[in-house]
Amino acid sequence: CLTGNSAMGKGTVARIIARLYKAMGIVDKGQVFDFKVERMIGLMEDEAQRSIGEALVKSSGGILLFDEDSPKLNEAVGFRERVRALLMNQMAEHPGSYIIIYAEPRNRVSGINGDAEHMSDLVNVLVFEDYTKEELMIILKRRLEKERMKMTATARQYMTVFIGSLVATEERSHASSRLMRIVADLIVRNC
């Protein structure tokens, strides 16, 4: 289970794990099939069951990234639990046949582990912490250095204030690394 805010690298880590598992002979394909749970909103239960089954078949020989990291899912009361139950049913029919990496937003890790009876194969939880102000500044500096650019003292001062406002609250820090990369790209394009 990988937990953390958006743009913290959960998908990247899943792809690295897939390549490692392929190199070790655990899986035949070093591929990750990314299954966004939000696309199931509004489906009838049999359609949702079929959708999960198709995702498992497509990921066969590789890894299924079961991605619950979407703000849309917060609005659908009980949806996560129903989808998890469908996934557990599919896994119970073919025990040991699938490798699933479960990605969820920060502070929701207790959800899937709550069904320990059916989730005994989940042994590791990796938490992706939000970036600090210093780490976000490093992301910006590295991006600018790739383009052989440097910030002036004034620019660094403005960016320090901007980054401070990004991490001021948990809501604001959500996807801050993605935003920092976008800001860096805008600076590069406009200079």
Regions found by a protein language model. Give the residues of each.
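Conserved AAA+ ATPase small/helical "lid" subdomain
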Residues: 126, 130-132, 137-191
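Substrate-engagement module of ASCE P-loop NTPases
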Residues: 56-58, 83-98, 143
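Structural recognition of the conserved hydrophobic beta-strand(s) that form the central parallel beta-sheet
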Residues: 65-67, 85, 97-106
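Short glycine-rich substrate-engagement loop in P-loop NTPases that contacts/grips substrate
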Residues: 29-59, 81
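Conserved nucleotide-binding/hydrolysis micro-motifs of P-loop NTPases
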Residues: 6-8, 39-41, 70-72, 105-110, ...
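A short helix-turn-beta junction within AAA+ P-loop NTPase domains corresponding to the substrate/partner-engaging
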Residues: 112-130
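Walker A/P-loop
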Residues: 1-30, 54-57
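Conserved ATPase-coupling elements of RecA-like P-loop NTPase cores
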Residues: 44-48, 70-84, 95, 111-113
